[in-house]
Regions:
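Phosphate/ribose-recognition catalytic cores of enzymes acting on nucleotide-derived substrates
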Residues: 208-275
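Residue-level signal for inorganic ion chemistry
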Residues: 41, 94, 133, 193, ...
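Positively charged, low-complexity intrinsically disordered leader regions
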Residues: 2, 8-30
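N-terminal catalytic cores of NTP/NDP-binding nucleotidyl/phosphoryl-transfer enzymes
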Residues: 22-82, 86
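Classical nucleotidyltransferase
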Residues: 113-220
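Active-site-proximal cofactor/substrate-binding loop regions of enzyme domains
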Residues: 64-76, 81-127
Length: 275
């Protein structure tokens, strides 16, 4: 499955996706959650649930402000395998929880140099006219990540919003975070990742044509480019594959193309029952 082309404004079900801050009037004065939300793990889900409940109680619209690319990948050009999920997966998950709208801010050089107060003033106040702003406890924003909970609280009266901090979600006395999940993925502990995400971890990618050698030895595989995903420990995994509406089990190898004797890192999947 490929990431959809998202223009200035797209409709995904009943959820509108904005790629700039030209926000419709009906979405101004809403309840807003802010963050990278990479993986949309159980901690993120807690933030979204509380924000959604507030929106319902106040009869307001509910939206999320997030960033693309993930800031870590913007600041570290050499970091290629960092994401827990793709933008397409993020959009799909948010659509399922019935978000009213999603704002994807282009994280570029100009935006990275915006001060914390300017972010509050220009994005939360002028463009969104936010009524309530929900964040996780460790969220940082603005130039050099100087914006934090204290800064957000300090500007509440000036910019006419109320900020609400969600208590962190914990698992075995550890705060659930995207960075923790990446570390666990690196170690290949995918069942543990499932608990932190609240669902199985999955990847999507373009199937590329190989040399057909696996087919010749009776072990045909789909070769999938993983792009910017966090890569698990090299090895063999039992997987479930979804192709359109068809679900199949299979076995996958993440490594250096064992059936091809090559050196490039690849995900190869043998899907049971498909020749």
């Amino acid at each position: 499955m490929l990431t959809p082309i998202i223009t200035n404004q797209n409709l995904f079900g009943k959820m509108i996706v904005y790629r700039n801050l030209n926000i419709k009037k009906k979405h101004k004065g809403s309840v807003i959650a802010i963050g990278n939300f990479d993986g949309i793990h159980t901690g993120h889900q807690k933030v979204l649930k509380e924000a959604k409940q507030k929106a319902k109680s106040k009869k307001l619209k509910f939206g999320l402000v997030t960033f693309e690319p993930v800031p870590t990948m913007f600041f570290n050009k050499n970091v290629k395998n960092h994401r827990v999920n793709s933008l397409n997966q993020k959009i799909s998950f948010l659509q399922k929880i019935k978000l009213d709208f999603l704002v994807i801010i282009n994280f570029n050089k100009a935006f990275s140099n915006m001060s914390a107060e300017n972010f509050i003033k220009k994005v939360l106040y002028k463009e969104l006219k936010s009524e309530y702003v929900f964040i996780s406890q460790n969220f940082k924003f603005g130039k050099k990540r100087l914006g934090n909970i204290k800064i957000l609280k300090n500007f509440e009266k000036k910019y006419l919003y109320k900020s609400i901090v969600t208590i962190p979600q914990k698992n075995k006395n550890q705060i659930v975070s995207s960075s923790l999940i990446r570390k666990i993925i690196y170690k290949g502990r995918v069942q543990e990742v499932k608990k932190l995400l609240g669902r199985p971890w999955c990847v999507e990618g373009e199937v590329i044509r190989g040399d057909q050698r696996g087919r010749k030895i009776g072990f045909p595989t789909c070769n999938i480019k993983l792009n910017s995903y966090t890569l698990p420990k090299l090895g063999v995994y039992l997987v479930q594959v979804k192709i359109d509406n068809l679900k199949k089990r299979g076995i996958a190898n993440i490594g250096y193309r064992p059936t091809f004797n090559g050196k490039s890192l690849l995900l190869e999947v043998n899907i049971f029952g498909i020749k």
